[in-house]
């Protein structure tokens, strides 16, 4: 058997998350089904499991296929079976593990105060976010190594809640004709819904609904103030570093 590394982008609006679902509506379901049509029966491992409605620009996968498959040949036959909501961007033969070999994951979150068209609603979150300075003040609190037990939803395969955030910041950008705030956060890995809970905490602080002390208290696992993640539709798994 040969091990392959695939880089894909997908529209999270059409799936119930990355992981397999009972009704076969997960990204993993779609990919494994497409491989099965080619006679390839393999579990597909992802660098990160995204929630329902979360998108990916550069999700990385690893899986195995028979030796008669070259990367070029497999790309040719697999890409059309994933389209249109999953795009196979790159495929190469590589002996690695998509999840365990990943060193950093980078996420981006797009937020605008108002949408000019409903057709962008699945891809840009809409809501007030206060000031850019306040958002960056809050984001800085998360940089470093922390126990994120109070910044995760129940479930998921992770047993160690400690994670390292290498960088987290926000900036303004014009995206598809909309003035947006773009959050960027880079960590070694993230717990279930952790990124969205962090984004929610930062927005609520910027809107003066919670204090910086309350964020620190939650980071230190003393008391949880933020329990509901921010909307999923603005979140993108942007890049995975190996």
Curated annotation (Swiss-Prot):
Belongs to the tRNA pseudouridine synthase TruA family. It holds the Pfam family PseudoU_synth_1. It catalyses: uridine(38/39/40) in tRNA = pseudouridine(38/39/40) in tRNA. GO terms for molecular function: RNA binding; tRNA pseudouridine(38-40) synthase activity. Keywords: Isomerase, tRNA processing. Formation of pseudouridine at positions 38, 39 and 40 in the anticodon stem and loop of transfer RNAs. Homodimer. Gene3D superfamilies: Pseudouridine synthase I, catalytic domain, C-terminal subdomain, Pseudouridine synthase I, catalytic domain, N-terminal subdomain. The lineage of its organism: Bacteria, Pseudomonadati, Campylobacterota, Epsilonproteobacteria, Campylobacterales. The active site is at 51 (nucleophile). PANTHER family: PSEUDOURIDYLATE SYNTHASE, TRNA PSEUDOURIDINE SYNTHASE-LIKE 1. Its EC number is 5.4.99.12. Substrate binds at residue 107. This is tRNA pseudouridine synthase A. CDD domains: PseudoU_synth_EcTruA (cd02570). One of its GO terms (biological process) is tRNA pseudouridine synthesis.
């Amino acid at each position: 058997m040969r091990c392959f590394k695939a880089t894909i982008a997908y529209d999270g609006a059409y799936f119930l998350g990355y992981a397999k679902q009972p009704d076969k509506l997960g990204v993993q379901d779609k990919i494994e089904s497409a491989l099965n049509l080619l006679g390839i029966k393999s579990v597909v491992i992802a660098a990160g499991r995204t929630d329902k409605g979360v998108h990916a620009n550069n999700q990385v996968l690893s899986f195995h296929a028979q030796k008669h498959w070259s990367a070029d040949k497999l790309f040719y036959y697999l890409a059309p079976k994933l389209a249109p909501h999953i795009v196979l961007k790159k495929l190469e033969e590589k002996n690695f593990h998509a999840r365990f070999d990943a060193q950093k994951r980078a996420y981006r979150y797009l937020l605008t105060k108002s949408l000019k068209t409903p057709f962008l609603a699945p891809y840009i979150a809409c809501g007030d976010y206060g000031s850019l300075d306040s958002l960056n003040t809050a984001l800085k609190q998360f940089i470093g190594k922390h126990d994120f037990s109070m910044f995760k939803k129940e479930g998921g395969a992770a047993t160690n809640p400690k994670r390292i955030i290498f960088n987290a910041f926000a900036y303004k950008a014009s995206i598809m004709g909309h003035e947006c705030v773009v959050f960027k956060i880079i960590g070694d890995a993230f717990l279930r819904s952790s990124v969205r809970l962090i984004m929610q905490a930062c927005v609520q602080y910027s809107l003066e609904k919670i204090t910086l002390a309350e964020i620190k208290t939650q980071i230190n696992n003393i008391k949880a103030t933020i329990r509901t993640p921010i909307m999923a539709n603005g979140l993108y798994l942007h890049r995975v570093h190996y």
